């Protein structure tokens, strides 16, 4: 797939099959993330992969609880109160795998650097026929 085609056609996916993502594919996605530029070439990222459904559900539930508790301090979250209160809502949309990018506190702007790595991963996922969603 051509780069421009990938950029123009990638969309956030919120419905997934239950098909497992194999290790080779996950390795390709992480390698794509590692290729992202970073300020001063610090490369302040590390990656985590979770495919355990129960653990992903626990993280989803804990995240929703945290966000609900944060609404008074972060009023922009108010519009999500009903969604986060819904026990059926899974913050990861029941994806078969969760690939996280963690920012190490190094360099001038690690969160922006990790965002670039995440974008590379999402573009690579699309080029491999996989859906992704920025969470």
Segments predicted by a language model, with ranges:
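Glycine-rich phosphate/pyrophosphate-binding beta-alpha loops
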Residues: 37-41
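Small-aliphatic-rich amphipathic alpha-helix that forms the alpha element of a beta-alpha
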Residues: 33, 99, 104-135
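Specificity-determining recognition surfaces
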Residues: 1-27
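Short, cationic motifs built from Arg/Lys/His that form the positively charged side of catalytic pockets
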Residues: 10-14, 34, 56
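Glycine/small-residue-rich phosphate/adenosyl-binding loop
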Residues: 43-114
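A structural motif
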Residues: 26-34
């Amino acid at each position: 797939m051509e780069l421009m085609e990938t950029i123009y056609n990638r969309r956030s996916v919120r419905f997934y099959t239950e098909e497992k993502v194999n290790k080779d594919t996950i390795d390709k996605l992480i390698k794509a993330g590692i290729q992202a530029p970073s300020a001063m070439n610090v490369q302040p990222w590390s990656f985590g992969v979770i495919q355990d459904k129960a653990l992903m559900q626990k993280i989803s539930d804990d995240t929703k609880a945290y966000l609900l508790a944060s609404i008074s301090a972060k009023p922009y979250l108010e519009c999500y109160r009903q969604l986060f209160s819904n026990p059926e809502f899974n913050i990861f949309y029941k994806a078969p795998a969760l690939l996280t990018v963690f920012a190490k506190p190094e360099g001038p702007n690690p969160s922006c650097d990790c965002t670039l790595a995440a974008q590379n991963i999402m573009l690579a996922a699309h080029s491999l026929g996989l859906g992704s969603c920025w969470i």
